[in-house]
Amino acid sequence: AESLIYLAFLSSHRVANNVPLISLGAQQAIIRTEIERDDRTLNIDLEINASKANRARINGNPTRSQREILGACQIVYFSPEDLDLVRGEPGGRRDFLDRLLITRTPRMAGVIADYERVVKQRNALLKTRSSASALLPWNEQLIKFGAQLTADRIALVEALNPWVTKNYANLNEVKPASISYKCSSEGVSNNFENNVEVLTKRLEEVAYQEIERGVSLIGPHRDDLHLQIGDFPAKGYASHGESWSMAISLRIGSFNLLKSEGSEPILILDDVFAELDTSRRKQLMSATQIAEQTIITTAVESDLPAELLTQKFYV
């Protein structure tokens, strides 16, 4: 399951770098996949390296960038770590949005990578108290990539929200649930041109503060996905059961959204059934009925509902 997730996002959902994914003493790991879609067969090889850039091949032909394989394997996964989407820090929720963005629109991987590169370089300049003229080209790039990323994230949240609300209600929860985009810059929207204006103005307003603190204070790297249950934010107020319901609703809602737009993502349920009560297990099971392909992993076979024990592989 983890190899498919890596193939879909070019990063692991469990570890921060490639080293733990490679066998001790080896120089690289290789994922080989055959994907059949729209009467076409794609053979994708991805070489994962610990100390240099990954390399990819499509039908034996080297790609210029590993990002060219994004979109070939669409994944929605649910794992025990998803409880952190509700209880954890904003970075995890931003990562959730960005991975769904990449699945929905693969070209956004380039925008996200460019934005992260700009923020890193800009922060390095701010720490050295560089002049305004040195910061100017990086400000322009932060505005350009930040405006696009913010617009696409907001559009994604607007499209995902009804599915989250519906799935949460299907879990027989009494309080309604919703999601919204919490931005560090007031006035942004799903419109790129509007966001360029907003970010330009906000950067001017915080220019002195940024130099004093040595860090970029404005942009989507400071934003959050707000999760609401009833009258209160889920983080800090949701019960253990409500937190699981919200996590399930986010993941199954993601699957519903992609499917409604014509995609057929693979649904991966990674060792989660032991964590769930009967009603939440049933909600996950209902999702497997509409998925073209579902992969379920578990360390303990008895954790799985009997209805799902169709074809088993032991690893």
Ranges and model annotations:
Residues 17-18, 97, 104-153:
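Long, non-coiled-coil amphipathic alpha-helical linker/lever segments
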Residues 18, 132-266, 275-279, 283-286, ...:
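Conserved NTPase motor "head" modules and their coupling/switch loops across ABC/AAA+ ATPases, GTPases
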Residues 1-6:
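Pre-Walker A-like glycine/lysine-rich segment at the N-terminus of P-loop NTPase domains
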Residues 78, 265-268:
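Hydrophobic positions in the central parallel beta-sheet of the AAA+
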Residues 8-92, 98-108, 161-166, 195, ...:
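Nucleotide-state sensing region of NTPase/ATPase domains
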Residues 270-272:
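Walker B catalytic acidic pair
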Residues 307-315:
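A short helix-turn-beta junction within AAA+ P-loop NTPase domains corresponding to the substrate/partner-engaging
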Residues 33, 293-299:
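Structural recognition of the conserved hydrophobic beta-strand(s) that form the central parallel beta-sheet
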